[in-house]
Amino acid sequence: MGRKQKSKQGIPPTLEENHNSSHKVTENAKKRKHSKEKPQNSRKRQLAEEKKSLFENSDSENEKDLIDADEFEEAETLSDLEHDEEPQTFADEFIDDEAKECEGEEEDSVFDSDEEHEVKPMFSDDSGDEEDLELANMEAMSRKLDEEAELEEKEAEEELHTNIHPEAPTVLPPIDGFTDSQPISTLPQDLSQIQLRIQEIVRVLNDFKNLCEPGRNRSEYVDQLLNDICAYYGYSRFLAEKLFELFSVSEAVEFFEANEMPRPVTIRTNTLKTQRRELAQALINRGVNLEPIGKWSKVGLQVFESQVPIGATPEYLAGHYILQAASSFLPVMALAPQPNERILDMSSAPGGKVTYVAALQKNTGIIFANDSNKARTKALSANIHRLGVRNAIVCNYDGRKFPNEVIGGFDRVLLDAPCSGTGVIYKDQSVKTNKSERDFDTLSHLQRQLLLSAIDSVNADSKTGGFIVYSTCSITVDEDEAVIQYALKKRPNVKLVSTGLEFGREGFTRFREKRFHPSLKLTRRYYPHVHNIDGFFVAKLKKISDKIPTVNVADDMKDGTNNDVEIEKNSTEIDNITFNDEADKEIIEQNRRKWLKSKGYKVAKKKD
């Protein structure tokens, strides 16, 4: 009989009670066996379960285990009674064995947690080990990074010491003009190799003392660089040299590279019909990606991409905007027209600038929109009507006939003179090869005549005006500073004033062997590689009198004081201003002879 049965008295339990007790013991034994055989997934999971059982359910589990132990003993007693009364079946033997096994397990499972397992603190030893491991890894990584930084610094220092006397790159052809197999001139032109050679030559010229090849001079490198520029970008040697002289070596290459890329597409809001915010919203709704052109303009928008033709939208046809280069805003902004003024635009086609002037005047005053090319006046008239300009008169005269044969007395005159187009080469690639020295001389002469006519057409006594703005889309000195210098000599009754433009480089006051008036620093130059707009030149002059002083202009220019000259009493009115045709013919003849000599023709000596 069982241990408890020996100490008890009374009627033994019924068969049903014995069966229920045995069934409970069997289920408990199976649960314990299943929990014992269940594999542990990981150490972390085991630790978590132990913590949970320790801190949350330790008391309840101990009580449960004790209750199960009592039940097991009671079941064992019943089993002993059954053994005395009737023989055991196979199932009973199995239950008995299971109960005995569970009894041993039960005795082991009831333990004092203080004896066999120490209560772990909130941060256990294992988590501390993990933290120590993480700290060790962080320290190792930090040491590794420090070592790498130290190594990089050491390599940089070694490279710096090496670059003090770097090896000179071989970019020039041999002195004898031959390679190992064939002459340089017969070698195929690989554009990628030419580009690399351009970069190497620029690097050498920027540090010529340390990188030049022995026995080579700077002119050889410059000559090779110009040859490569002509081959790579497609310029004539004459134009490449003319543009190369304007910049440093590095900047010159940047300029040539910028001429291969188009400028951003820009539009100007017509404030006579709409506002920029409203126009931008309307175009965005049509799938146009745009943004304001910059803080310097209140009407310009730059278009990045468009799902519709930007020159055929309903807004365009309604005259809410006009496609206009950002550089064309600048002369009008410098002119700063005021309402109710009489203004002359001497070369106004296709109408971007004249319509901007009308918008600033709010359709007040009067504008003479002149252009010497009759065919271009058609586009001019079309834009004037489309944009709703009502204060403009379109005329077709040679600008040199103002004011004597046409009309004068304007408050302001805008002269966007015809030019070589060296600032907009990306628009017309033919400029690279079809411009000669004779073309520049002819254009420069025409520009000087037009500027003198513009000065003479302005009323110096205007209460609000008396200004002339001269601009070109060229960056050559012959068409820009040289023309202004000529006008200052011929018309001492004008002076240069600030353009009022917020950005742009100052004009040249000296260029190579040429020296210009100090006030030319008030002019502004714009370059595609610097400002991301067309190459442009803008100058603003103020007419201080309608009379031309009879002073020695040549001596006055040496002193640099012709702009502030006092108008003397013995002045002549400009009622019948005429050009010196003899002097013009002489200049033209000199240019013709010079051009013939450059082509290799023998020119007879000039007769006295």
From Swiss-Prot:
The modification Phosphoserine is found at S58, S60. It is found in: Nucleus; Nucleus, Nucleolus. Gene3D superfamilies: Sun protein, domain 3, Vaccinia Virus protein VP39. Its main location: nucleus. S-adenosyl-L-methionine binds at S347, S348, A349, P350, G351, G352, K353, D371, D398, D416. Residues 68-116, 147-158 have a biased composition (Acidic residues). Residues 16-29 have a biased composition (Basic and acidic residues). It holds the Pfam family RsmF-B_ferredox. Residues 1-130, 145-169 are annotated as: Disordered. One of its GO terms (biological process) is maturation of LSU-rRNA. Keywords: Methyltransferase, Nucleus, Phosphoprotein, Ribosome biogenesis, RNA-binding, S-adenosyl-L-methionine, Transferase. Its EC number is 2.1.1.-. NCBIfam families: nop2p. This is 25S rRNA (cytosine-C(5))-methyltransferase nop2.
